[in-house]
Amino acid sequence: MHFNLRAILGAYLAAAAVASPTPDLAARADAITSLEQLTSVITSFRNNGNPTDEAQARAIYERIVPQSSPSSMQEAVAGVKTITDANPGDIFKSGAEILLGGFAGGTYINIINAYLFTGSSNNINLRQPFPPVYPKADPRDAPYSVSESKLRAAIYIPPGFTYGRKQPLLFLPGTGVRSGPSFASNMGKLFTNSPIADPVYVNIPNDVLGDIQIAAEYVAYAVNYISGISGNRKVSTLSWSAGSVSGQWALKYWYSNRDKVNDKIGISSDYHGTVFAKLLCPGFETPGCTPAIAQQNYNSTFIRTLRNNGGDSTYVPTTNVYSIFDEIVQPQADPNASASLNGATNVELQSVCTPVLPGGAFYNEHAGVLFNSLAYSLAMDALTNPGSASLARVNAEQACAQFAAPGITLPDIFNTYAQLPIAALAIIAYQPKVADEPPIMPYAQKDIPA
């Protein structure tokens, strides 16, 4: 009964994220109700205040009264694309305008409260894996620096999880967000409603803004733990952005994961980092303002260490889907896409759908690939066939003609775009800020390029 209540309440809170703003907020004297007002407030904040002050930044977001939300998917994605194009690298201002324009489906408070359970990193998982997976599931595994209790608490297992009757599918989040909120309204929803996979959400503390090497510990443990409580059935992973990097690091240094992962599916990944990393933290000393962003600079020491000695290639069957219109990760065009790995099925949406068809159009940016029909078709194909996905097995013509994957609704798109303001505020809130990337862990120092 306890878990059913959580599911019901969680669904209610998620629905609340697309509700109208509360009358109290709209009536506040300091409510922000126009773009001109918002621009003035942000300019004043940056010129006269402390642009790194999380409390001031949060107060701005909480004052924003969303205007009438778009009435169609086409209007929603076009509006968000216009905002991100107008504010290149300014994730805070883009997030604010997404809230104001109604593209996130609700107020900032609505959004934060919508996924209290699926976004939790304080879960109670009492089942014990067999055989034990901590401190090592394989003698060759890298050592953990995080306690088993913390690693396990980050795993949110939804009500109805079948413990191996369906293939477990671990969702790995990107920078600045949690897994549940990132996926529950797109790929997570679609696979929950399918007989193919059983979603599990890995909610890494600090929103994947800390050291990615630590994030990889959460991934490595989650893979072994979920397999160990699911009859030792292999699991698969579906990751967004930096989640793909933490997953690849886990596969490289936790040998036990290679035997436990059936498929690795990456959406908008950045295995080579991104030339835009420095733009995500204006006002901070470069190359980064949080450890993870510093690590994701194109050709950072972390990235070069990951890619060296085999990390630029697959360890398990891998499918990567990405878009040239990604506003966060670049380069993202073949043959130099950051999302590409040697030996993987690497699919640039525009090379298949062209930019003319909906499946490859301009609105397929960093978050848009999460509800892209071809991306979902390829993920489904990978999970239902041996090896990685194959374009020859999917109906690419049909998928490219669709605006979003079947089953995705307008509120789902709102909830997906709501991750941008969440990430923006998480970046500002993260402490301590850094001027350089963390040192490479001792177990990986042998792979630092000379």
For the regions a protein language model found, what residue spans apply to each?
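Short alpha-helix in the alpha/beta-hydrolase fold that links the catalytic acid
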Residues: 184-185, 330-337
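Catalytic nucleophile-loop/oxyanion-hole region of alpha/beta-hydrolase
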Residues: 204-221
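The conserved beta1-alpha1 loop
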Residues: 170-174, 203, 240-241, 268, ...
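Short beta-strand/loop motif that positions the catalytic acidic residue
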Residues: 314, 320-322, 326
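Flexible, membrane-associating and regulatory peripheral segments of lipid-active enzymes
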Residues: 3, 15-171, 397-399, 411-450
